[in-house]
Amino acid sequence: MSDESHPHERHMTPRKLFYLALGSVGVVYGDIGTSPLYAFREALKPVAHDGVTRFEVISLISLMIWALTIIVTIKYVLFLLRADNDGEGGTLSLLALLMKTANGHTALLMLLGLMGAALFLGDAMITPALSVLSAVEGLKLVTPSLAEYIVPISVVILALLFVVQSRGTGAVAKFFGPITAVWFLVMAAAGISHISDDFGILAAFNPYYAVSFLLHEGFYGVVVLGAVFLTVTGAEALYADLGHFGRRPIQWAWFLLVFPALTLNYLGQGALVLGKPETMSDPFYLMYPQWALLPVVILATAATIIASQAVITGAFSLVRQGINLGFLPRMEILFTSETNTGQIFLPSVNAVLFFGVIFLVLSFKTSDALATAYGISVTGAMVVTSIMAFEFVRARWNWSLPVAVIALAPLVVLEMIFLGANLLKIHDGGYIPILIATAFTVVMWTWRRGTAILMEKTRHTDIPLASFVSSIERKSEHSPAQVPGTAIFLTSDPESAPAALLHNLKHNHVLHDRNVILTIRTVNKPRVPSHDRYKVEPISERFSRVELLFGFMESQNVSQALATLRKTGLKFDIMSTSFYLGRRKLVPDAKSGMPYWQDRLYIALANAAANPSDYFRLPANRVVELGSHVII
């Protein structure tokens, strides 16, 4: 993103910059802000088998600080935030941009993008479960007798979180930033208060300790990397939420608040363990005096709920992008705000996430156990993003191959090492995110492939629209009766006569005064300006071809978009217009090009898809559906 390409950033007032930066603290940094609850604790475990040494503690903190510096600061904050698609970030946004310039390896790029999106959806299940569990576990330090109630309390909190999604969070979202900012300030204060326990912890800024530890610890060093990576979980949110806040507010929030607070807190935890080794069982909560524990647990729970909310909202947005880009079937999308079309609720996605999150909490029961499963989905998503970023700088910024390799290969290698370290935890629950991501990838790939096969098969039997119109406009005794009004026929192929039009002629023997062949197309950019929304092409006296263009971040409100067509002279009353939709009954074919099980999956997805009249927000009492059988 450049300031020139986004005038609202170039002319942003200091006041607006402050409020956007504050808002980004709650949404963008909520996930990474909950990592101190468990990251250092988990990193200590692999080396605690024979007691931790001073060198090991300083080295672990050094690894965490430099992971935050290299992966979050350099890769995401300074580099990836500039690799935008008209201001939007995220895996599918980057994929949509690359699809415009892909040369010969479109399928590989698509598969990578789908894997990245699937890993993010897996992360959307694990993050709420792990974050809330880790916060509520602080209760056992307040009152040990509450230990047995941690799982039930976590389940209740998470259940309430998913229940309120349908009502929207607009009313309380304005508090997310301030609450999370207080959380970061409290963490920073706790860190500062304990650095004096052992000023030797400041040596962690020296990368010598991080490198030396990895070189000397061997296998344990690799295992530790899996836990160290927990410090950077949530970094993908920086890129995914780029379009909501803009580059500068996200960068300012990182450098002025988030990065310093995280660094100070990790230094404080390290100094505490150096001074009091017995605190390594839970260094985060043991930084606070007994009287402050309950307020900190409450604040931590609020912060984890906000982090979970941000991930859930991100999942809704990602799925809508997937639907609009043709990677997922249409789903019911409800708008929870009358003024902000970005505030959406997808009941089916909410249900899948809810059951997945509750299953994880009941299965793993502790944040210790769940943390082992967490890193794989995040490291996988980061590796995918880095590979796609390599393609981006080559295709969009015209970097030469040597420059791109020199700049990005070290990042990819580092993240591959982190991924390898996390893969060591497959038997301890690491298989869970792999299974989740595989399932989502198969669903998206099946939908994309099945839709392409279906279009190819129907194209062989379709009648070219130009030929059809030419024949129907010739007057003869067999011409259909003409009736007043306008008929709009929705079709995915503007070059062929819609099946609904042919069936209407076959069964009703009528043709309207005005007939519009309407195609809805999603372009590979986030939004389409209103003056570029439509393309109108007269075919004959009674037929017109109209194409409505939407960005992948937009709601496809066809009724509203058609109202703008009046500017072209194509006048009609939406409430006296009939919309004709084709409904296909799909039948599996052994020679479809996909395995039988994939045929069945595609048909199941098609049957479960939202009704197009609801999805495109057409007036229900003006819609006519005509069915047909199609063998896929």
From Swiss-Prot:
One of its GO terms (molecular function) is symporter activity. Keywords: Cell inner membrane, Cell membrane, Ion transport, Membrane, Potassium, Potassium transport, Symport, Transmembrane, Transmembrane helix, Transport. It catalyses: K(+)(in) + H(+)(in) = K(+)(out) + H(+)(out). Its main location: membrane. Coiled coil: none annotated. It is a multi-pass membrane protein. One of its GO terms (cellular component) is plasma membrane. Pfam families: K_trans, K_trans_C. The chain crosses the membrane at residues 17-37, 60-80, 106-126, 144-164, 175-195, 210-230, 254-274, 292-312, 344-364, 370-390, 401-421, 426-446. It is found in: Cell inner membrane. Transport of potassium into the cell. Likely operates as a K(+):H(+) symporter. PANTHER family: LOW AFFINITY POTASSIUM TRANSPORT SYSTEM PROTEIN KUP, OSMOTIC STRESS POTASSIUM TRANSPORTER. Belongs to the HAK/KUP transporter (TC 2.A.72) family. This is Probable potassium transport system protein Kup 1. The gene is kup1.
